[in-house]
């Protein structure tokens, strides 16, 4: 059985706790050998990347350097981390100047990086390494009657991911169907939710989030299922403000790992189901789940 | 600023693909290093390993051989024969101490003007880094050494004779 | 060794000429310096520079010098030999010198145009000149070999290009075989309703030419057939053609179509390829009423008899000519031709590669070819613009450049899309009265009366929005967008993003090379450009010629091209073929190989090397011999001969060794 | 009051245009055919003063003042839609990044976009702890930019508390010294660069 390193990133330790809880629970249930990256630091995230490029490369570089010692694939569930780590990989490979700067900086810290680490997303690993077949076998109570709007957000399939289609990604749909859920087809799968702006330019962020939530509701989804802590936070956390600015949508936003966990018969408490600000209880009950 | 070494590269281009590609590069005004001297042959298969050896012997720092892509040869399969011959030749040259891309075989189709540019630029860069091969010079030195050696030997003999005489 | 030899002999008198080519060469190479340098080289009797060597005065100068200065060799430093070698050989001959006592130096394409430093470019020119002067001494007096040209012609591809080329040749009295892959000739044009910019009906102008092909005494028409093998050389090609089985005897069928009515399938239920799947057909079918030849055929994929052998075969029964033959097998035919015209056409871009436009996901999205059938009076809806769901569109969006001008799909502009989009916009508006929006990046209407056609459309009130559409979705944000297809685009001329709801989307797909273009070009031993279209010999001066003499290209197999240009090119290709045939013979380059018998050790190394089996072994003499008619002059044998007894004219060892020494000697 | 719209060649800065195309990510800028698909696909373009397409053209023509002063670069949410759609493979997102950096350097970014502040606090926090505590970051940010907006956020704060998604204790890494060495080394590198230039 293949071994993996796990890069949580800051969000999964904070507002994205439920993602970490459910992801690790599912890995455990699948018997995956996965270990948290030793003494990892913040990846730099896109906000930082946009103004302090080289530094964020170095931040990501330190994590990659630590991972390289172990010579294992790194799983980064957070979209921002996934993007930044991959972008760093690419920059270090293709841009000699950046490589020089970053590698020297790392040396100063007593670190060394050759550039061999593979940064991967849980979807990629679950579909391509574990395989739908094995997952389907472990589905004890399929979430029948649960109608989901799979929402991938921006930074997973764009621009670096190679494991899914950039215009119409399907990996999460496959997993959710395997879990017994029904997936609505909708065109906003990969449209930005404005998460990175809600904090700084709220009026804009809120509108983008509202558009996503409203369309999901219109398509008859009981809940949105996502794979990005920032998207989850943005779509879940601001529904109060959205209600006052536009209209109340009341749309629970789950992590795909939570739904998968439930279908595999794991208790909701281990999957952080209660951490949603918009409660998913009712919808899940509809899906025959407690 | 010190004059940097400019390698001399002899290039054998097949008429149908690589020579045409070089013409195309010209028509498209692509700019590349002026170090290669093209000798036109009808097919890369006409290139006798002796030509390559002769080029090195006469002072080339690099030899480039360009033909049609496998399967595209104007003469059906000439380039396959080239490939076989040149594999052997490459090993031979290695034994003679000529390697590190001083001899290079490239498939360049008539449409790949840009490849002519990149290949010649790249090869010029690499061979320049390797420095002069200068076989003619080496030959001279070797001749000189041998002459000196002979001279010494002859001298030695004379001394002996002297001793006997004494 | 070569060099000693050259020193012993008294050197032949060489004339060296260097061309300025206006400023093309002179701007990057110090022509005078090279000319002076050459003058001082051993054996050079005359060294001159001139503004345009290829001009008449230039050639005259050479001819005159040869006589006056008793020149024995000629070297011209100018452009590529592919361009002017023949010109200067003729000049040599004019001066009374054997044309092969000439060597050309390429200092334009290979030096002046590709370098930026005048000093090093000039040095390079000197080296190349010195090499040619050293080499030309070893040249021998040669004669071109004449071979007769077979007057028959093969035309491959029965679209408008092939049809026009075949008719032109046949009218000139040549026997033409036209080979078409599909069951009927006509190509893409046969599917169109109207043609831009004149809006005359495609069928009205095409079908007469199609029947002319069928009835022409000089044309043999082989449809449902493909060329499988090509051997030989210019003037003498041997071609093998495979004829697929129609399961109907072509010579017996009169196209009454009784059999189609009789078929066990009472209703047509299979995807109709000719109608882009918008219509249905039976297992026994004919593409369209004017199909040529008007002969039915049976589809082995769907015919019960052919699949299971268990059918009552009412079709065969209904045929009073007894034309059906379910045991028909593919047959191969061979023919001899002197020239070949390739007009294999194009393929349209596969819209599945652009999922963002929703083709296949939203039934309201169509490809341009589908719409051609939809607006076609003889199409599946008899020209009525009805959507797949039976409704009539109130608003239609036409997206230009789908699969064109895009690094992710095809980089090139497909040249015809702007114009056919205008045509479709006009026809859709005319047939349905719908609001029509054209989404374009740049409007390209460069042909005769094309801009006027654009102007006409502007007058008709068609909307033109300059911007590339991002995506087609069913995502509504306002009430009027509900239930519509929404196109999101920046109106780049207004400077803001717009969302435009429509009922029908037309994807103006670009043109691509045929999927099997690579195999075909290998079969005919020609080249393809990097984008995959057939490569012409020269983009301006030899647009229908290829690098293989006697093989010509016409139409969209060479590059995206509209009907007027295609027909013009087909005519040009036919003319090239005619000039080859009517000359009656071709002169082949004398660069063939021969064996110096006394030096041949009889080792047989060369025999298996020749791809044309031109080398045989004379058991009596224990020597190899080369048939110079079969030899194509690659020189592979010469390179391989251990005893060096094989000599390739124009590329003898002496010549090449001296050239090597020439470029290196300083 | 009417504003003059004509631009004179003197109004554009060719050096700036050269600079943009010379940066990593800016390479293909000159190849833009102004098809506008970047604007069409951009979820934020409806708020931008100049659409991405217009910004690209202004940048390559050297209208530095307008480009660096625009909201556009600050509204980019780095969703990379434009980068994926661009038929000329222009790295629009990265161009937005490098324009942001330049705007900060020249101190011309519009005050209402506290992204630079966010970034600075972000950096400070990482330097201190090696990781980022979102709660502290957000509080910090709002206190520095617009504190009554912060009051508006308390509702969300309570919710996060309730669901145990908010902690006020910063996460820290063990080997902070190592990380600081790395970051300092970069600063040093930058400094030496700048000195080399001046």
Residue positions per predicted region:
Chain B
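Iron-sulfur-associated redox domains of electron-transfer enzymes in respiratory
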Residues: 1-166
